[in-house]
Amino acid sequence: MKCVFVTVGTTSFDDLIACVSAPDSLQKIESLGYNRLILQIGRGTVVPEPFSTESFTLDVYRYKDSLKEDIQKADLVISHAGAGSCLETLEKGKPLVVVINEKLMNNHQLELAKQLHKEGHLFYCTCRVLTCPGQAKSIASAPGKCQDSAALTSTAFSGLDFGLLSGYLHKQALVTATHPTCTLLFPSCHAFFPLPLTPTLYKMHKGWKNYCSQKSLNEASMDEYLGSLGLFRKLTAKDASCLFRAISEQLFCSQVHHLEIRKACVSYMRENQQTFESYVEGSFEKYLERLGDPKESAGQLEIRALSLIYNRDFILYRFPGKPPTYVTDNGYEDKILLCYSSSGHYDSVYSKQFQSSAAVCQAVLYEILYKDVFVVDEEELKTAIKLFRSGSKKNRNNAVTGSEDAHTDYKSSNQNRMEEWGACYNAENIPEGYNKGTEETKSPENPSKMPFPYKVLKALDPEIYRNVEFDVWLDSRKELQKSDYMEYAGRQYYLGDKCQVCLESEGRYYNAHIQEVGNENNSVTVFIEELAEKHVVPLANLKPVTQVMSVPAWNAMPSRKGRGYQKMPGGYVPEIVISEMDIKQQKKMFKKIRGKEVYMTMAYGKGDPLLPPRLQHSMHYGHDPPMHYSQTAGNVMSNEHFHPQHPSPRQGRGYGMPRNSSRFINRHNMPGPKVDFYPGPGKRCCQSYDNFSYRSRSFRRSHRQMSCVNKESQYGFTPGNGQMPRGLEETITFYEVEEGDETAYPTLPNHGGPSTMVPATSGYCVGRRGHSSGKQTLNLEEGNGQSENGRYHEEYLYRAEPDYETSGVYSTTASTANLSLQDRKSCSMSPQDTVTSYNYPQKMMGNIAAVAASCANNVPAPVLSNGAAANQAISTTSVSSQNAIQPLFVSPPTHGRPVIASPSYPCHSAIPHAGASLPPPPPPPPPPPPPPPPPPPPPPPPPPPALDVGETSNLQPPPPLPPPPYSCDPSGSDLPQDTKVLQYYFNLGLQCYYHSYWHSMVYVPQMQQQLHVENYPVYTEPPLVDQTVPQCYSEVRREDGIQAEASANDTFPNADSSSVPHGAVYYPVMSDPYGQPPLPGFDSCLPVVPDYSCVPPWHPVGTAYGGSSQIHGAINPGPIGCIAPSPPASHYVPQGM
């Protein structure tokens, strides 16, 4: 049995007893589900007659020794404003309504009731009867809002729910849907608020700004329309529970009960299934199950159910300028006003006077909080409010750029206990008539004077109403947005990033922070520090923060707790990440210490995007192990598997990677080759090539560039003239090495005769288009000064690994006169011979028999053309590529250029160019004539000439066309179709052309030293069906037991006992039958030594077919050697499988 207890204490309060005991009040109490009313009348003259019926009981008495028992049994207490009664009731945790007796002297009860109400403990009112009852029926004041003091008559005040008193004031459970609408008992009582209100003082702002100034045109028009009606739209969290949040706020003065309201709605619809089932398509039970999910939105069917539950009719404002829609018309006096947008979102609609009253209440509450809880001096609060209102300047760009509010969020370092600064806040609730100074921003000259955060000052101001519920939701939403980003012009912008903003065309740039992303992802809301303003600006007006040093953007940020790297979405990191680091991290990155490796990638200038993630490598600093993150493979793999685990002898001077471990694992899980570069005697620099990135040993205190990547993403060494690259748009990657001594990496031994060091340029020299003189020169400043004349200060000798012997070097000289990789331009370079050496550690090669080779320029080398006709081949002087059905063997040379012998039997291939400083060696004996070729097909159009110097031709070939540039657009718009897979393989194909400028067919002379090897198996040649469709090659597969024998004896088992023939061996070119034909002017070519040091050279088996579109490489990626790579492609399967 639910009970209401009314007490007046020891005095008399006849007005209260008369109001409560009136017949209409008793009927109202009974209709609300209360079955008993207990009156403690004291010394009053009004004594109601007690009675008892089956449904209701009235008990009356004057005094008792103690009221604790009645208070404990009561579900609601209505009391006079005596201090003892109030405190005793609140101690029991009961909902309390205090009625003030205005006939007492000095009205001391009002002061006590005001203070307790400010602290949120109770509600209070008076018993005055209104002279204008018509105000009670006004729907302008939101029902259920005790704070609205304008017209809280019996009808309006009937919205006060007893469950509200229990849940809102004392955090008790909400009243169930069985008795949802408990109204106040006494019709003649009038709600009273302590501060008198002046209507002219609180004129609201026309067209309240939406949160972050991102209102749509329809929302702005709706706000203007509601303002003309004396209403305003209070924003509700934009989630699936917006309808239940709005109803909870209008019923219970808080949005925290939206989940209970949702559950009550589901329960009511389940109990009254016959009423609602006809409106639902499909299973009604499943519909209710989905409705119970907080992520499921609700509509008009739920509004009808809620109207029946809470005895409210719903009025919806849907279109600006049009009258509202009555969604329900059940005849209820109480109304709930909502605003419905086209996106299905619901907001609450209140009167402007409610907004004014709520602003005063909020200011009083925050004042009590800071004075009594945080013990802040009252004068300090007043000073802060005055400074908040007057200490700012006019917002000059408010109307143009959409500056959302007048104030900024300064965080005080000594206010950690206070709430954080709001990153984005709404000012839709600012009254029109309040101090115009608040439209201005705080003076940037001395912003540190603000003692409190902006949100606190906003809530302390009684003239501003802060939408706390919406602020809380917005903050939580922004936490989720931190993992998201938006992309513009190839650059990704994250919430909270620091940037520079231009407010006017060709105006100055201001430092700012990104606060919010626009609805259409074409604009952002930024907070400008200098102006202390928020502005909505297009993405075109943003640019990254300019660094003082030429410091590039880091590819990844290391995790503080772990040893790995954090995954960055999309593989790109904004350049402003560096600015967000603390001082220790910046010092650790920018300070170069001898022996440490610093990984960095120079970004494009003027906001251009970085290289795609597949061409970048992760940086590391500190003690984190260098690792590379593969976005395609989705895992992180270190190169420790391919290098010794013991430290280097000079590890004490640096803690980076081992000196000889500059390679990472590529996409096929194989280490790439290292290209050794010799700038001079006793000096060696390494550049490692793989499918991810190109890295070169960097210099110390020097500005000579060793390896560069121009902005077309084409790779090569710079000419050896000491000239620096111009422009930050050239993407460069370095890592630092320390100087060594002459014994760390000795010069290559000369076993067969004198060898000459070729001048220091690259076999892969790339003609680069000259930059305009207007571009700045790359300048990496270091603390210890710079080097004069761009020379190296130190001997770049790298200490050999203890368990690794110095491998042999395969050297070749390639002319760079006709190599032009620039897009749409030809490059003229001096015909200078260059040397590039591939260095393969002998231990990494496993148990592979190496063969030394020596090539002369007068020996004809067959070349496969990649011209337009796919089935044609270019015949050389004496050998045709179509004749290379089986490998041809010639006698080894007896004289000529000496071969450098090394423990790993290096192979040398030299093709001197005219004008080279090396004397031409004597030619070796010519190879035996090959078998007669098949009848050639009709001649194709003249293909581009091969790169062999000794080849002559009477026809003038057309100039070579440049290959297409690298794909660098992160959105993939420069690709044919695919944006992820195709971009990688497209660039990989181009890399193959840039990387493999070798002859299509080369010969390998037999070693002077007889090796203990077994014979190779003989494979039968499949019949040639069609030259346009090359057949699959066979390959030697590793079998169980055979590989172990081979690794132990340095031999390779064969199927027969026939010896390997002596002489030069001609290797065919492996073609890709599924690749596209390359551009004319570039021959598919093949290195003698494989690109991957862990895989041995393949023995020639099968036929080389002319006109192949692409080549695979030197070897098949089969499981040979010390690691097991990925299986070969489906179109390249050995015939023996």
UniProtKB/Swiss-Prot annotation:
Q: What is its EC number?
A: 2.4.1.141
Comp. bias (Pro residues): 918-946, 956-967
- A GO cellular component entry from the record: cytoplasmic side of endoplasmic reticulum membrane
Q: Its Gene Ontology molecular function terms?
A: cysteine-type deubiquitinase activity; N-acetylglucosaminyldiphosphodolichol N-acetylglucosaminyltransferase activity
Q: Does the keyword Membrane apply?
A: yes
Q: Where is this region: Deubiquitinase activity?
A: 126-400
Q: Where is the OTU domain?
A: 231-352
Region Glycosyltransferase activity, annotated ranges: 1-125
An individual GO BP term = protein N-linked glycosylation
- Give the span(s) annotated as Disordered: 641-660, 911-974
Q: What class of enzyme is it?
A: transferase
Task: State the Gene3D superfamilies in the record.
Answer: 3.90.70.80, Glycogen Phosphorylase B (3.40.50.2000)
- Record-annotated active site: D239 (for deubiquitinase activity), C242 (nucleophile), H345 (for deubiquitinase activity)
Q: What region holds the Tudor domain?
A: 492-552
The domain of life is Eukaryota
Q: Tell me any Pfam family this protein matches.
A: Glyco_tran_28_C
Q: Which cysteines are joined by disulfide bonds?
A: none
- Which UniProt keywords are present, listed alphabetically? Congenital disorder of glycosylation, Disease variant, Endoplasmic reticulum, Epilepsy, Glycosyltransferase, Hydrolase, Membrane, Multifunctional enzyme, Protease, Thiol protease, Transferase, Ubl conjugation pathway
What family does this belong to?
Answer: Belongs to the glycosyltransferase 28 family.
Chain's role: Catalytic subunit of the UDP-N-acetylglucosamine transferase complex that operates in the biosynthetic pathway of dolichol-linked oligosaccharides, the glycan precursors employed in protein asparagine (N)-glycosylation. The assembly of dolichol-linked oligosaccharides begins on the cytosolic side of the endoplasmic reticulum membrane and finishes in its lumen. The sequential addition of sugars to dolichol pyrophosphate produces dolichol-linked oligosaccharides containing fourteen sugars, including two GlcNAcs, nine mannoses and three glucoses.
Record: disease: Developmental and epileptic encephalopathy 36: A form of epileptic encephalopathy, a heterogeneous group of severe early-onset epilepsies characterized by refractory seizures, neurodevelopmental impairment, and poor prognosis. Development is normal prior to seizure onset, after which cognitive and motor delays become apparent. Some DEE36 patients may present with an abnormal isoelectric focusing of serum transferrin, consistent with a diagnostic classification of congenital disorder of glycosylation type I.
- PANTHER family from the entry? BIFUNCTIONAL UDP-N-ACETYLGLUCOSAMINE TRANSFERASE AND DEUBIQUITINASE ALG13-RELATED, GLYCOSYL TRANSFERASE-RELATED
Q: What is this protein called?
A: UDP-N-acetylglucosamine transferase subunit ALG13
Give the source species.
Homo sapiens
Question: Gene encoding this polypeptide?
Answer: ALG13
